[in-house]
Amino acid sequence: MNLKEKTRALFAEIFGYPATHTIQAPGRVNLIGEHTDYNDGFVLPCAIDYQTVISCAPRDDRTVRVIAADYDNQVDEFSLDAPIVTHDSQQWSNYVRGVVKHLQQRNNAFGGVDMVISGNVPQGAGLSSSASLEVAVGTVFQQLYHLPLDGAQIALNGQEAENQFVGCNCGIMDQLISALGKKDHALLIDCRTLGAKAVSMPKGVAVVIINSNFKRTLVGSEYNTRREQCETGARFFQQPALRDVSLEAFNAVASELDPVVAKRVRHVLSENARTVEAASALEKGDLQRMGQLMAESHASMRDDFEITVPQIDTLVDIVKATIGDRGGVRMTGGGFGGCVVALIPEDLVPAVRQAVAQQYEAKTGIKETFYVCKPSQGAGQC
């Protein structure tokens, strides 16, 4: 049974009437452009064929009822007429409540909803299961009540909910690609203007995601430290964001900066340039150049931004040794564990899978999880 069938069946069973709509919003993987989003820079993600699915129907009152199929059918119920506050014990509820609360501040021309939620975006892997949930919930209200909100506004609403209600700092990329993703394409997103340009993916290329299964521990505190270091760098150049600083300007005065801040700034500036070039390489079907850019990105994250761990570096080395110059591989996501992403010809997938299976656990003591994905469509009815 797929997620649509599962949520529709559960909806009818629990609520006693059929759902009127089923909405999906995908997870994502970022091909290149890491820690550039909160510096107003560029990112190049694609939506993947793992998603959050919600079967839903409008109610004729002001109550929102939610069933989480993946959490033993836990229930949350709240009123649109009372202040929406955080749930004490169900963390998943806060993503739903946060989205609805912030939606009310944007456009409160909506009533109650019944919904059943299920998803298959791996959690804790850096593939944006939370953004996928936020965008799916926002799209439910937009579709059921014909709210005049576009994908970018639904994405911004999800980001606000995560930053302000759930209390987790994040850039806009995850929600934006979940809302705006395009089948068989990546999106070059300008995180300042939220402009997105569809970049076609070469035919016969697989998007492979390998989870290191190294438990991320430092990610919150270190993420915030990196943000502060980037802000310090922008202040040094008297610019609103590092987006506005050129590599030439940086190189001229790099020695005057705190050495650690200088390394962080150099990563962001070089990564921005790599990301724009990567979009053009992908469009031309130049997988060799894309692979070089991904390798440079990984080295920069490892040496300048210092967000990789030995397990991730090992995984990258195993994949790189297998694919040579026929594709690319790098860490993807916030860092300190999580996943690597590889762009490789489909005929190389079995060899990569085998090499990783034979070597990664032997070298690290951890078993990886291997996903082969397709660039997929953003949020909407399914």
From Swiss-Prot:
The keyword Kinase applies. InterPro entries: Galactokinase, Galactokinase_bac, Galactokinase_CS, GalKase_N, GHMP_kinase_C_dom, GHMP_kinase_C_sf, GHMP_kinase_N_dom, GHMP_knse_ATP-bd_CS. GO terms for biological process: galactose metabolic process. The record marks R28 as: Transition state stabilizer. Pathway: Carbohydrate metabolism; galactose metabolism. Keywords: ATP-binding, Carbohydrate metabolism, Cytoplasm, Galactose metabolism, Kinase, Magnesium, Metal-binding, Nucleotide-binding, Transferase. It holds the Pfam family GHMP_kinases_C. The active site is at D174 (proton acceptor). It catalyses: alpha-D-galactose + ATP = alpha-D-galactose 1-phosphate + ADP + H(+). ATP binds at G124, A125, G126, L127, S128, S129, S130. Mg(2+) binds at S130, E162. One of its GO terms (molecular function) is ATP binding. Its EC number is 2.7.1.6. PROSITE patterns: GALACTOKINASE, GHMP_KINASES_ATP. Its main location: cytoplasm. It comes from the Bacteria. Catalyzes the transfer of the gamma-phosphate of ATP to D-galactose to form alpha-D-galactose-1-phosphate (Gal-1-P). NCBIfam families: gal_kin, PRK05101.1. This is Galactokinase. It comes from Salmonella typhimurium (strain LT2 / SGSC1412 / ATCC 700720).
